[in-house]
Design a protein with these regions (language model features):
Chain A
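Positively charged n-region of N-terminal signal peptides that target proteins for export
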Residues: 1-5
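Bacterial N-terminal signal peptides
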Residues: 6-14
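N-terminal signal peptide c-region/cleavage motif recognized by signal peptidases
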Residues: 16-18
Length: 185, 146
């Protein structure tokens, strides 16, 4: 069962099996600013449904999440300064200037509580997400899934804000698009 | 791995192992202990897992131990991934230990020094037998002897 789950997660994250190192992850979108690298892969409905169903979600319960515009994100601190980032400060910006925030893991978890999703499934969900608040020491890196609060049609850019000892910064991923199973997975 | 600011005391950790026996971190006081939080569905966790066994072999068992804390999964799932690990695998089924240890993402690894304090932390995958990390561990063992 674990090999099957790994294969599903590989689909979700875009990695090639076997997984050997973080450098093996094939990211479709990547930006580097100074010592910070931000990466993303679009996620489709079928792969997310399969992954979370295998973790204990009923297909009906996970559907809103699987249908949302979702990505797997990776963020790495290749420098020596401590970085921090809050998902609440990230925005997806459409070509028309419309800005959409990302839905936080805790907001999804409230929905899972109301839907009586089993605790084990909620734990797996919680830790498979890009966490709401992250602190990166030298060499640290984090990956996880996240969804937009509302879909954006066409391409858009993701503006991710982070903080270090010199102040606030932005790193931008261009030309993102919501994933569709026919092309993204 | 990065130094933990203030070197605070390690939170408590007493969880069942793969045989259902409760293993308490306190029993390892006097040893350096590398505590790895992981899950089988987490690709970087799987990648780094073999290096936990390799790094354990580099040190005397009287000086160093590795503990892998699985988050939220059952024994069958873990057993099918790591049937006979060379170190204790503990089960944090409700993720309460993760909360106590203020873990912010998987995998996260902490090194508890011989005085039971949090000395080093790494967020994201590592190869723990990397010479740089091994040197950090050796230095902590050396400091603990003095």
């Amino acid at each position: 069962m674990n090999i099957r789950l790994l294969a599903v997660f590989a689909l979700l994250t875009g990695i090639s099996l076997p997984v050997r190192a973080e450098g093996d992850i094939e990211w479709r979108h990547r930006a580097t600013q100074g010592a910070v690298t931000l990466s993303a892969n679009p996620l489709g409905l079928a792969s997310r449904t399969a992954f979370y169903s295998a973790r204990g979600f009923a297909a009906e319960a996970i559907r809103p999440y699987a249908q949302a515009c979702g990505f797997s994100f990776g963020m790495q601190n290749g420098g020596t300064a401590t970085l921090s980032t809050r998902l609440a400060d990230w925005r997806a910006v459409g070509t028309d200037g419309r800005a959409v925030r990302l839905r936080l893991p805790a907001e999804w978890d409230l929905q899972w509580a109301k839907a009586h999703v089993p605790e084990a499934a909620r734990i797996a969900f919680r830790w498979a997400q890009f966490q709401a608040e992250n602190v990166f020491e030298a060499g640290d890196w984090i990956m996880g899934m996240a969804t937009l609060e509302a879909p954006l049609s066409g391409s858009f850019r993701l503006v991710a804000r982070y903080h270090d000892e010199k102040g606030n910064h932005e790193i931008v991923l261009d030309k993102l698009a919501c994933g569709h199973d026919s092309s993204a997975n | 791995m990065s130094p933990v600011v203030g070197v605070p005391p390690a939170p408590t950790l007493a969880l069942p192992d793969m045989d259902g026996k409760i293993i308490d971190l306190a029993r390892y006081r006097g040893k350096l202990v590398l505590v790895n939080f992981w899950a089988t569905w987490c690709p970087p966790c799987r990648t780094e897992f073999p290096s936990l066994g390799r790094v354990r072999k580099l040190f005397k068992s009287t000086e160093f131990e590795v503990i892998a804390v699985n988050v939220g999964e059952d024994m069958e799932t873990v057993f099918s991934f790591a049937a006979t690990p060379a170190f204790p695998v503990l089960f944090d089924r409700d993720a309460l230990a993760m909360a106590r240890w203020q873990i912010m993402g998987l995998p996260t690894t902490l090194v508890v020094d011989r005085q039971g304090r949090l000395a080093l932390r790494a967020v994201g995958g590592r190869e723990f037998d990397d010479p740089v990390i091994v040197a950090q561990l050796r230095e902590l063992i050396r400091q603990g002897r003095t």
